[in-house]
Design a protein with these regions (language model features):
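Fe(II)/2-oxoglutarate oxygenase catalytic core
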Residues: 1-134, 138-166, 172-193
Length: 193
């Protein structure tokens, strides 16, 4: 098969968008859990090598957000069930990939004028080399501006899925979360292998 002429192609990142992974009520419950039950989360850190040892360190030159692992087993079970029922079948269908492992869920908050994650890959260090796909569910589209995903190797296109929808993409793809300009962007993320 011959490639399409340039006029018929669009340079866009190979990202799977899955609508309705979480329903709005679950999204609202996850935001409440992060803000109330988990005290707003902790400042997100990055893993660095220091004096021959791996350490977590806050580095606003790389990312700035709050995060927590869910502390409510019932909420976590609801998230897992929806992932199994709504997202994983699409990953098999589109990427021909059978998920066998999932990293812990993380709830994220990207606050106004202080929420971003500069361009990075999700599987570059030995502790995360097992990761194959990232999955991120937007929890409150429309309550903020900015905060879109961008894949700079594939052009300027921005991705901001609706509330409850997921983006799934290869952990090897360079990507960023652009700065949040107004409001707070909430999301849930995990990594699949």
């Amino acid at each position: 098969m011959l490639p399409l002429p340039a006029a018929q192609t669009l340079g866009i990142a190979p990202v799977l968008q899955v609508p309705g992974v979480f329903e709005p009520e679950l999204c609202a419950a996850l935001i409440r859990h992060l803000e109330v039950d988990c005290g707003g989360g902790d400042v997100s850190a990055v893993l660095v090598m220091q004096d021959g040892e791996q350490r977590l360190q806050v580095d606003p030159g790389i990312k700035q957000r709050r995060e927590t692992i869910p502390r409510d087993p019932q909420l976590e079970a609801r998230m897992h069930e929806r992932l199994m029922r709504r997202a994983l079948p699409e990953i098999v269908r589109v990427f021909n990939f059978e998920v066998r492992r999932r990293d812990p869920f993380k709830l994220l908050a990207y606050p106004e004028n202080a929420g971003y994650f500069h361009a990075h890959r999700d599987n570059e260090t030995p502790d995360v080399a097992h990761r194959r796909f990232a999955l991120s569910v937007n929890l409150n589209q429309g309550d903020y501006t900015g905060g879109e995903f961008r894949y700079p190797e594939f052009g300027p296109h921005l991705f901001s899925p609706p509330t409850g929808a997921a983006l799934v993409f290869s952990c090897s793809m360079l990507h960023e979360v652009r700065p949040v300009e107004r409001g707070t962007r909430y999301a849930m993320t995990t990594f699949l292998a």
